[in-house]
């Protein structure tokens, strides 16, 4: 089995394609279930965020994985990147460390990788191979972020959006801000907004209790999502990041809100994939819509300033990839020995138990021992004997040469005879 990663991200695919490829809510467990039944796939995990969808798998053939992804979202194949074995390990280490993120060093991705691991594990999609890889990934990411400044004062997509809002509204503290959703991205936006102060903070969410929790923490007002129409016109700035499959803010809603506002400008940040705000909202005058792709350009300065720390983190990852691959190779070399030892031990235990049962049933010990010896010999030598017979028929010189090394001939060699004790008697000793 080979380790594969196939995926697309903000660098390889536009947002409309990424939102079609995303696995949100219950779609992720269902996708893992459909992967598990593929005979070519032994283990699998799915990482799905607003900026990437990636499939990690232990599988024979990547084309099976490509076909599965293309069935989920037709048209993906031309945008996919693909890594195997050591490069797949390196990719996951870089992703979890934040080196492959839109915002270099952003901290949220490590939690998202942990979530992907936890969901795959809970649904029985992980085996020892991927489980060990993810555990090592968490360790490497922690070390890279501890030993370098790649994670120092991280700039997230949410904080970048808040900064743009502050630059667009010189007096954001006199503005009303509406947050749609209550997940991690909205939590970060609420945190940054409360630090900078806003006149009024509205938080709308499908589950009102979650919105109330955020509102209590950051001095906002919680609203059920069903009341979005009534309050949208109050917002000077809107941040939206839900897990909905369809837009929660439509063009019709924004048009109505702008009329109510008497064309007073409205700034909207769509931080979700799939998108929360209909793309055609950008066509409306007085509505200024930013998507996650727009924010990538805004964070490029941050990426350059953190490049030195990233180079240090890359060096740590290079070392850890080499060590991880070396450990895997050592385990692979030991695997045949472990299987051979396990086969010998299980055969011995099975036949020994049978011999003991025969002894307890009163069978003569000599007969039991002879049968045990023959059975052990036959059981242990049958697999290599059959393999060597096939090798001879197929002219497999590698296997026959290996057998010569394993069982060398020693002409003239004989096992030393077992010494028989000499019992002296009076008759055997002549009289002096």
UniProtKB/Swiss-Prot annotation:
Pathway: Porphyrin-containing compound metabolism; protoporphyrin-IX biosynthesis; 5-aminolevulinate from L-glutamyl-tRNA(Glu): step 1/2. One of its GO terms (molecular function) is glutamyl-tRNA reductase activity. NADP(+) binds at residues 181-186. The record marks 91 as: Important for activity. Its EC number is 1.2.1.70. Pfam families: GlutR_dimer, GlutR_N, Shikimate_DH. The active site is at 50 (nucleophile). Residues 408-432 are annotated as: Disordered. It is an enzyme of class 1 (oxidoreductase). Homodimer. Possesses an unusual extended V-shaped dimeric structure with each monomer consisting of three distinct domains arranged along a curved 'spinal' alpha-helix. The N-terminal catalytic domain specifically recognizes the glutamate moiety of the substrate. The second domain is the NADPH-binding domain, and the third C-terminal domain is responsible for dimerization. Catalyzes the NADPH-dependent reduction of glutamyl-tRNA(Glu) to glutamate 1-semialdehyde (GSA). This is Glutamyl-tRNA reductase. The lineage of its organism: Bacteria, Pseudomonadati, Pseudomonadota, Gammaproteobacteria, Lysobacterales.
């Amino acid at each position: 089995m080979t380790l594969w990663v196939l995926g697309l991200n903000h660098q390889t695919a536009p947002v409309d394609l990424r939102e079609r490829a995303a696995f949100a809510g219950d779609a992720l467990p269902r996708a893992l279930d459909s992967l598990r039944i593929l005979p070519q796939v032994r283990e699998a995990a799915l990482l799905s965020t607003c900026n990437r969808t990636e499939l990690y798998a232990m599988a024979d053939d990547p084309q099976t994985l490509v076909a599965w992804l293309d069935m989920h979202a037709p048209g993906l194949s031309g945008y996919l990147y693909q890594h195997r074995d050591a490069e797949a390990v390196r990719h996951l280490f870089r992703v979890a460390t934040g080196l492959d993120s839109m915002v270099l060093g952003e901290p949220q991705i490590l939690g998202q990788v942990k979530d992907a691991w936890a969901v795959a594990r809970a649904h029985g999609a992980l085996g020892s191979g991927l489980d060990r890889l993810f555990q090592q990934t968490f360790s490497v990411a922690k070390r890279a972020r501890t030993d370098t400044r790649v994670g120092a004062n991280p700039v997230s997509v949410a904080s970048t959006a808040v900064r743009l809002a502050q630059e667009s509204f010189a007096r954001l503290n006199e503005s009303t801000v509406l947050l749609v959703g209550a997940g991690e991205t909205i939590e970060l936006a609420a945190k940054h907004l409360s630090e900078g102060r806003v006149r009024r903070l509205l938080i709308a969410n499908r589950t009102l209790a979650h919105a109330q929790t955020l509102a209590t923490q950051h001095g906002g007002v919680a609203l059920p999502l069903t009341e979005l129409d009534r309050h949208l016109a109050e917002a000077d700035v809107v941040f939206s990041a839900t897990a909905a499959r369809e837009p929660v803010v439509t063009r019709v809603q924004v048009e109505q809100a702008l009329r109510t506002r008497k064309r007073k400008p409205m700034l909207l940040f769509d931080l979700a994939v799939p998108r929360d705000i209909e793309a055609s909202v950008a066509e409306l005058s007085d509505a200024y819509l930013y998507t996650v792709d727009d924010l990538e350009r805004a964070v490029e300065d941050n990426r350059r300033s953190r490049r030195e720390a990233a180079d240090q983190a890359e060096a740590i990852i290079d070392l850890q990839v080499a060590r991880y691959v070396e450990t895997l190779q050592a385990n692979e070399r030991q695997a045949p020995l472990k299987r051979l030892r396990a086969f010998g031990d299980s055969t011995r235990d099975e036949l020994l138990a049978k011999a003991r049962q025969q002894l307890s049933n009163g069978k003569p010990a000599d007969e039991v021992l002879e049968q045990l010896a023959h059975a052990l010999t036959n059981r242990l030598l049958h697999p290599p004997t059959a393999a060597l017979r096939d090798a001879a028929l197929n002219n497999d010189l590698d296997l026959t040469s290996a057998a010569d090394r394993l069982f060398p001939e020693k002409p003239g060699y004989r096992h030393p005879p077992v010494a028989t004790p000499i019992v002296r008697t009076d008759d055997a000793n002549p009289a002096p």
